[in-house]
Amino acid sequence: MAIKIIGIGDDGKLSLLPMYEQWIYESDVLIGGKRHLDFFQDFQGEKVAIEGGLSSLVERLKNEEGNAVVLASGDPLFYGIGSYLSTKLDVEIYPYLSSIQLAFSRLKERWQDAYFTSVHGRSIKGLAQRIDGYKKVAILTDEQNSPTALANYLLSFGMTEYKMFVAENLGGETERCQLLSLEEAANQFFSPLNVVILKQVEESPVWPLGIEDDEFIQRKPDKGLITKKEIRTLSISALQLKRDSVVWDIGTCTGSVAIEAAKIAREGQIFAVEKNEADLENCRENLAKFRVDAHTVHGKAPEGLNEFADPDAVFIGGTAGGMETILDVCCSRLNSGGRIVLNAVTIENLAEAMKAFKERGFETAVTLAQISRSKPILHLTRFDALNPIYIITAKRGE
């Protein structure tokens, strides 16, 4: 038995080398999407349409005694079924041009410096921080996450420095390619078969680690309801975030920690919970301003944490008297190698946290941050002290 995965374009047989077409007609079983199978009405063997998950297809191919060909769009290893099937079966892969290659050729742009991602069959959540700042972004779409939906999504984060190149039905009889503003794309209908390239035509705003406090929209700036820049920077450093970290921000308030974390964990997921509805709305305004698409929940932790994916990093800015129950959930669900960072203002909260972590088998390290900022006084300068903060870092004991 031999299994060949052959890439095919929207122009069907015209996209195939003669050798590939010969293999198809000599095979016993031809497998593919209905659209691909329709190109081979005269195939004499068995035709199997791919429907639903791929696990049943793998079992079918494992038991196949004859030669089988699997048809896939473009390059089977570029967000295609080839990646999955090659880990389960002994296959040979013969790619066609990927839709992204074709789209860049139509745009007449090089593509080795582009960022590639897909929202095909996937949630669009988190896309904003993943792509923010890249000069060129290639995106595989689907009917739900269409170019129209994508344009509206990007507009909601103010990402108007991008133009959208939409390539429809590439290689087919009804091929159409357009370079549009986001506003234009947001009001158009597109063929379901399309790919999108975002091209930056103006510089994107840049926010380095340690965003100034007054950059954030604050509901009560005079009340200090924000993790101050210096404390925020130290706390995020203690979390030791990776590019794909899953992060919880408990008691998010303005969302400052969630936002800074998202700039590091761009490929990860950011979750934030806040008990005060007005503060949560304030957080959402900041998320939009700083181009962070986080999961937000209104509730008093641990309420709402069951909606979050298991974390690699947890920041706790406030517990509202529920430290024990919050730490129960955080410690039990923390992924291997993860960290919890808790900010405490009082000695009593420090003692409670240290005791709670020890009882749960966690090792702790504490930094007392006593920050003072320079402040002008007439023609001189003095220092104005911020409240001392205990930064407690906890990880599972070895």
Swiss-Prot record:
Keywords, in A-Z order: Cobalamin biosynthesis, Methyltransferase, Multifunctional enzyme, S-adenosyl-L-methionine, Transferase
The reaction(s) this protein catalyses: Co-precorrin-7 + S-adenosyl-L-methionine = Co-precorrin-8X + S-adenosyl-L-homocysteine + H(+); Co-precorrin-6B + S-adenosyl-L-methionine = Co-precorrin-7 + S-adenosyl-L-homocysteine + CO2
InterPro entries from the UniProt entry: 4pyrrol_Mease, 4pyrrol_Methylase_sf, 4pyrrole_Mease_sub1, 4pyrrole_Mease_sub2, CbiE, Cbl_synth_CobL, Cbl_synth_MTase_CbiT, Cobalamin_biosynth_MTase
Keyword Kinase: no
GO biological process: cobalamin biosynthetic process; methylation
A GO term for molecular function: cobalt-precorrin-7 C15-methyltransferase activity
Pfam family, one: TP_methylase
Pathway(s) annotated for this protein in UniProt: Cofactor biosynthesis; adenosylcobalamin biosynthesis; cob(II)yrinate a,c-diamide from sirohydrochlorin (anaerobic route): step 8/10
Ligand binding (S-adenosyl-L-methionine): 227, 251-255, 274
Signal peptide: none
Enzyme Commission identifier(s): 2.1.1.289, 2.1.1.196
Region (Cobalt-precorrin-6B C(15)-methyltransferase (decarboxylating)): 206-398
Enzyme class: transferase
Coiled coil residues, start to end: none
Annotated region (Cobalt-precorrin-7 C(5)-methyltransferase), positions in chain: 1-205
Family note: In the N-terminal section; belongs to the precorrin methyltransferase family.
Protein name: Cobalamin biosynthesis bifunctional protein CbiET
Gene from which this protein is expressed: cbiET
